[in-house]
């Protein structure tokens, strides 16, 4: 596929989804059910509006059935499913139905909260629609087929995806709302993160612990003994996950994170990646000045190389009260973002000093977590 996008000054190639692969393989197999020859290329339309012409691989015929594969091409996206063979086998039915099944390497949904019912193969609604539309167009209204989608290496690759955490067992998911993989797409990561909220709510989780990454997760586990099922790694998408929490009617959120990440939220920055905004030293300095710190300390913090260095300078001058002030400010900003619909607390830490501060609500949320029985004793 030769379409490109420019990101951060780099020319990156688009790819196509597992859903497009499954659709193309199914269409090619349907064409070969109706004719004796082999189909070596197949065209499909994607929801994005782009047409794809894909090479058909590993054609196998048996009485009343055809199987073939399409090789997944993720373009320049770092996708663990890249180069996987996505197979579709079509078998004539006696009626006019089209039934789509999951075979080897396609996961099975085991927990509620996803778009797919428990017990069904992890083939998302858009790919299901794409497959049925393309196959029906080929075979017409008067015939029916069973379609089995399989991914021979899917079970192994699935261990590197979100699937185990989402309760999808035994393989990968057949995905793709647009049919196209946009390289280095934040939207794909956001979609995965957003899935975790309804799934946890389906398991009666009421108090969530948001951590930006592994450091926050480790602190939550080791210091506060918080169970993994309550934790969601939100990466840099603080604002997005707050918005999703409102949509999902989340009751309570405790945020646990490194000061270098969360101090940005105190300044109203809800996407915390450095390419979007930084301002860490400036925010620290502004709040120090507001609390009456000396000009010398403010200037030294502005000139510091890292947040860890700034924390050391602040503690050296006995200005530790800044940290509880910041924790309260982070909470205040998140409450404003969620329009007061969610009870929120914040805990901030540094790598060298450990926990720096709890906001005024954090202790209450820790007690609620304990009373809900989600902390390991």
UniProtKB/Swiss-Prot annotation:
Keyword Ion transport found: no
Domain of life of the native organism: Bacteria
This protein's record includes keyword Iron: no
EC number: 2.1.1.195
Gene that encodes the chain: cbiD
Pathway annotation: Cofactor biosynthesis; adenosylcobalamin biosynthesis; cob(II)yrinate a,c-diamide from sirohydrochlorin (anaerobic route): step 6/10
Gene Ontology terms for molecular function: cobalt-precorrin-5B C1-methyltransferase activity
Protein name, per record: Cobalt-precorrin-5B C(1)-methyltransferase
Primary enzyme class: transferase
S-S pairs: none
Keywords: Cobalamin biosynthesis, Methyltransferase, S-adenosyl-L-methionine, Transferase
Naturally occurring in which organism (per UniProt): Alkaliphilus metalliredigens (strain QYMF)
HAMAP family to which the protein is assigned, alphabetical: CbiD
GO biological process: anaerobic cobalamin biosynthetic process; methylation
Reactions catalysed: Co-precorrin-5B + S-adenosyl-L-methionine = Co-precorrin-6A + S-adenosyl-L-homocysteine
Similarity section: Belongs to the CbiD family.
């Amino acid at each position: 596929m030769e379409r490109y996008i420019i990101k951060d000054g780099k020319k990156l190639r688009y790819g196509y989804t597992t859903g497009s692969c499954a659709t193309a393989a199914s269409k090619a197999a349907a064409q070969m059910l109706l004719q004796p020859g082999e189909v070596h290329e197949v065209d499909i339309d994607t929801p994005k509006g782009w047409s794809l012409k894909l090479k058909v691989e590993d054609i196998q015929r048996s009485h009343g059935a055809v199987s073939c594969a399409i090789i997944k091409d993720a373009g320049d996206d770092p996708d663990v499913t890249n180069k996987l063979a996505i197979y579709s086998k079509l078998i004539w039915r006696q009626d006019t139905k089209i039934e789509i099944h999951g075979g080897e390497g396609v996961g099975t949904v085991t927990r509620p909260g996803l778009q797919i019912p428990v017990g069904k193969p992890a083939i998302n609604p858009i790919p299901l629609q794409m497959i049925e539309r393309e196959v029906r167009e080929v075979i017409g209204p008067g015939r029916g087929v069973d379609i089995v989608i399989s991914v021979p290496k899917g079970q192994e690759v699935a261990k590197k995806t979100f699937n185990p955490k989402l309760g999808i067992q035994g393989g990968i998911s057949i995905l793709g709302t647009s049919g196209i993989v946009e390289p280095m797409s934040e939207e794909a990561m956001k979609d995965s993160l957003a899935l975790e909220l309804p799934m946890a709510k389906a398991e009666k989780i009421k108090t969530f612990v948001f951590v930006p990454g592994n450091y926050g997760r480790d602190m939550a586990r080791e210091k506060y003994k918080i169970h993994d099922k309550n934790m969601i790694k939100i990466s840099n998408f603080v604002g997005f996950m707050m918005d999703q929490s409102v949509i999902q009617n989340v009751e309570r959120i405790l945020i646990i994170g490194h000061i270098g990440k969360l101090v940005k939220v105190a300044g109203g920055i809800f996407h915390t990646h450095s390419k979007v905004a930084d301002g860490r030293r400036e925010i620290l300095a502004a709040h120090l000045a507001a609390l009456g710190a000396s000009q010398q300390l403010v200037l030294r913090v502005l000139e510091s190389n890292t947040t860890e260095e700034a924390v050391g300078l602040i503690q050296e001058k006995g200005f530790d009260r800044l940290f509880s002030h910041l924790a309260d400010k982070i909470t205040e900003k998140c409450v404003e973002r969620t329009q007061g619909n969610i009870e929120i607390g914040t805990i901030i830490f540094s790598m060298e000093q450990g926990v720096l501060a709890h906001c005024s609500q954090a202790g209450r949320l820790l007690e609620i977590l304990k009373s809900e029985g989600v902390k390991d004793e």
